[in-house]
């Protein structure tokens, strides 16, 4: 499943699926989705990709943890509805305004974890902490990913457009 196109609302997202690990017993596998985001507060819907991974896994009972290793992103489950996404964008801007002062961005004060090419993104780190979700885990029962009727799996970009990764792990409980 390489260079897939996944429809994300009005956007189309290209991603590459990379197999990282498969156990000898075929009871678990770890995959990484590599993709580029396009904007701040972008919601990337990976539900169909995860459903396809589960279907191809042939796991009857297990779980699927999803994880982002980025501190300025989130993985959430919610409804794919334009009004909700617009409401989220408005409220997160009210709670953590882009134009506020963030000590994280003050190079005269900050002395830790600094890089020359670092983004001015204190607000993105605060937003990620408020959302507080770098991962979710869903059950697989009778070879079916258990997810609510209106629920979708979203990767949320809280910083600027950039290359990102989402790890998907399939675990067999049998």
Question: What do the predicted segments below correspond to?
Answer:
Residues 2-174:
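Active-site histidine-anchored catalytic micro-motif
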């Amino acid at each position: 499943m390489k260079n897939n196109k996944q429809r994300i609302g009005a956007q189309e997202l290209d991603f590459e699926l990379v197999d990282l690990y498969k156990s000898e017993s075929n009871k678990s596998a770890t995959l990484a989705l590599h993709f580029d985001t396009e904007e701040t507060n972008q919601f990337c819907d990976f539900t169909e990709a995860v459903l396809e991974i589960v279907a191809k896994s042939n796991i009857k009972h297990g779980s699927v943890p999803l994880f982002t290793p980025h501190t300025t992103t989130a993985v959430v489950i919610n409804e794919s509805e334009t009004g909700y996404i617009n409401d989220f964008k408005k409220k997160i801007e009210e709670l953590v305004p882009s134009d506020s002062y963030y000590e994280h961005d003050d190079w005269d004060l900050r002395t830790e974890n600094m890089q020359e090419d670092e983004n001015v993104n204190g607000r993105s780190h605060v937003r990620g902490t408020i959302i507080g979700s770098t991962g979710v885990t869903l059950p697989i029962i009778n070879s079916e990913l258990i997810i609510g009727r209106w629920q979708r799996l979203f990767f949320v970009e809280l910083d600027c457009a950039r290359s990102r990764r989402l790890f998907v792990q399939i675990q067999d409980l049998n």
